[in-house]
């Protein structure tokens, strides 16, 4: 398991700084007055989350099921763009877990206007760091083909040690 020791080396990732009210701030270089904050608050406007998912072209899911998924997740991470007193949800990810060994990251999304600026990487580093804080050592995710290389650059591997993910779908 040399891979995991290298993957979880604390020197291998940079950390966002603390922002107001305990949220973590990610510096932006876009020249405007916006700042980006990460939080683990679960109290989010589900319709705002739906708008974020719509912006990237995801299929709509029933709000009641999204609410349940957020409530039952082990960890929820939100990313907010702050301009003055106005905040806008611009990123989201969540993880389910057995609370001991394993976690799976789901629903990683960054608003299209902020993609390719390092925010997806920062969001993933943040959620990995939080999961490692809880001593979770096996972190998995499912990726669409067009983002596999993104996750590879973060240290995720396909089929580590020959392990295959399997799915069961109802008829």
Swiss-Prot record:
A Pfam family annotated for this UniProt entry: Acetyltransf_1
GO molecular function, one term: N-acetyltransferase activity
Annotated EC: 2.3.1.-
One Gene Ontology term, aspect cellular component: cytoplasm
Entry keywords, A to Z: Acyltransferase, Transferase
The N-acetyltransferase domain, residue ranges: 36-171
SUPFAM superfamilies in alphabetical order: Acyl-CoA N-acyltransferases (Nat) (SSF55729)
Family membership noted in the UniProt record: Belongs to the acetyltransferase family. Ycf52 subfamily.
PANTHER family linked to this entry: ACYL-COA N-ACYLTRANSFERASE, GCN5-RELATED N-ACETYLTRANSFERASE 2, CHLOROPLASTIC
Record-given protein name: Uncharacterized N-acetyltransferase ycf52-like
Organism this protein belongs to: Synechocystis sp. (strain ATCC 27184 / PCC 6803 / Kazusa)
């Amino acid at each position: 398991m040399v891979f995991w020791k290298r993957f979880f080396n604390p020197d291998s990732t940079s950390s966002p700084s603390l922002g107001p009210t305990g949220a973590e701030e990610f510096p932006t270089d876009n020249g405007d007055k916006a700042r980006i904050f990460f939080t683990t608050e679960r109290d989010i406007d589900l319709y705002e989350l739906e708008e974020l998912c719509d912006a990237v072209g995801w299929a709509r899911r029933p709000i009641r099921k999204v609410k349940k998924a957020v409530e039952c997740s082990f960890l929820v991470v939100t990313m907010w763009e702050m301009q003055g007193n106005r905040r806008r949800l611009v990123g989201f990810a969540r993880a389910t877990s057995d609370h001991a060994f394993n976690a799976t990251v789901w629903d990683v999304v960054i608003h299209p206007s902020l993609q390719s600026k390092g925010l997806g990487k920062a969001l993933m580093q943040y959620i990995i760091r939080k999961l490692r804080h809880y001593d979770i050592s096996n972190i998995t995710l499912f990726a669409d083909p067009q983002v596999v290389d993104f996750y590879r650059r973060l240290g995720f591997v396909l089929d580590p040690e020959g392990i295959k993910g399997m799915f069961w779908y109802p008829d």
